């Protein structure tokens, strides 16, 4: 793709459209970012906000909402621990975005021929090194924000949740998962082996912005499991039990897989849009390595995974595959009356997002890298992730409360 401007490289702020000429001669008109039309401090402030990519922050909020809904079955919420955890998730997403902004520009992925919104490092508003440092600082703050849950800080139990200053036993599962999430957020495009440049972006997003995020959110609310506090066991054994309990929570795994799959679909649309410029910068995403046809099938498959896994909630709700206190699955066949009484909203509510998923699939099939409709498809994929995750959270919370009333 060759960029052609009617003005010099740094176009005047009044110019609202950038003309791009593709390799086949087609011309796309990419709208300039709104902050580029501003001047002075207003432009700087707007660029700071744009650098955080506010529209992407739902990728941090949705796993927290789903994990919070799962925690409804564990007892009263622990908001003094959960609210800092939400702040940690948001800071982690912002830090990942800033590091991505700086590193993609440094490595040439965000060059003059880039499609999509203008990045602040690419536009020269801020030095890439400073953007990188701000991203690292956000990731450090994200780790610090998990301290109340990691240290099990005690509070008085009132709705306001005033901390008493007492520290409980260190929750090693929270420490390990938070540290690994921060490292993954940085290593996505930072460090000596950027995961996003080696076709590992979707895998990273699925694990850390899906499964791990949901598990951490639930754990922040529910606190340490009682069976991990065996006074006769060593501290190391209790820590291992704690980590196993958090990672082997089947409900959190399934919910995390659903939200993670749609976050991956969002990333796959983004990589399809940028496939041409990524290939030129040797950023080997799955769309670059296996082609655009594969990327389109990948988007469909990831969306299908999220909806197919909804059956899990129906099966566990009616009693098929339920686990007893000993962790062993039950095998009793549910009666028709039981099925009617235990209908799962967690399995049906997300189905309201099916039309949106079909729209994303139809749009993605018609896309080619750099096409002017790529950003609209990306917005639709983000809306799907938000709608599906919100409906799943509401359904899980409803099922948990219904089950508590039946108990």
Regions found by a protein language model. Give the residues of each.
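Small-residue-rich segments of transmembrane alpha-helices in multi-pass membrane proteins
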Residues: 65, 203-218, 379-390
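Membrane-embedded alpha-helical segments that form the functional core of polytopic membrane enzymes
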Residues: 74-102, 171-186, 247-269
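Intramembrane alpha-helical segments
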Residues: 117-229, 235-242
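Extended hydrophobic alpha-helices typical of membrane-associated regions
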Residues: 315-404
